[in-house]
Amino acid sequence: MFHPRFALLVLVFALSPLWGAHPQSSHDIWTHSNPADMGLSETKLRAMSVAARSADFKKIGSILIARHGKLVYEDYLEGDANTLRDTRSATKTVTDILVGMAIDEGKLSGVNAKVLSLLPDRARRLQNPDPRKFAMTIEDLLTMSSPLECDDWNDASRGNEERMYVVEDWSQFILNLPIRGRMHLGETIEPPPYGRYFSYCTGGVFVLSEVLQKATGARVDHYAREKLFLPLGITNVQWVYSPLNIPQTGGGLRLSSRDLLKIGQLYQNGGRWGARQVVTEAWVRNSTHPHARIDETTDYGYLWWLKSFRAGSKSYPAYFMSGNGGNKVVAIPQLDLVAVITSTNFNAPAMHQQTDKILTDYILASVEQ
């Protein structure tokens, strides 16, 4: 006969290794600590592990937490520490880091560099030419505020990413788009905060792949490996490529949960990893500063999302990577905390709400000091 007490013992045994010793590869340089030593409630984290496996949450893949630079919690509901996670657009943020590095190295003159000036072959084949296209900058693409008629959140948009995927030349497809309108039924729209009109455009971020290759002389996947991934001890990645074999910088890059956590921690450290300044602190600050308004609660930096998360009576400003399915890598400077939540709950109506609930009701609620 199955006894409830035995079920409880099994559950406790299953959950206890979450903050114990974990297998590490020679490239995984995380230092581990107990949650309690880092000011987190182990009781609350155990409750989170139970809840994440309940019917209240769908297809959660992993949950990891770093506090004060140490890995204090990891839980794998799908796969393990070596599983490469399909976090979709969350990895757009990697493109921000690579652009910052190219600027730091003098390969790019800065965020005001004109995109079509860097891609003269593309400019010569341009359809729907317009002075506003030739004035389009790297910053316009980093902030989802280019003049192109491209909106992934609008099925009718000519630049919707699903239309891009069915053609061979993604970059030319995007650059050939007409200029988007900002008038509705003859009514003027008030200038937005920060002076930029936000329109979520994966294709614009993909164009940065060619911009980076032109500037650095290296294909983006090779540049990322040498300049970003190896310094962080990241050795196992999986890129998506366009039909012309150009790395997709607009999302789809697969990394392990621990390696995603490293990217969040890199920015939490002001661009430093160990003794090495991987990307300048100035770039980190500018990337995570608001440049465009998405809605009344959310701003956008350079391919980073910005909003405050509330736990109880407290509100914590955060910047985060975000992707379809509810995938998130969240940094909360006030708490010196970074969290990774991966999920395969793709295209579900409440995909982001459920990962936000894990963050607010459990991770932030676990903070005791």
Model regions and ranges:
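Active-site SXXK
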Residues: 46, 69, 86-112, 141, ...
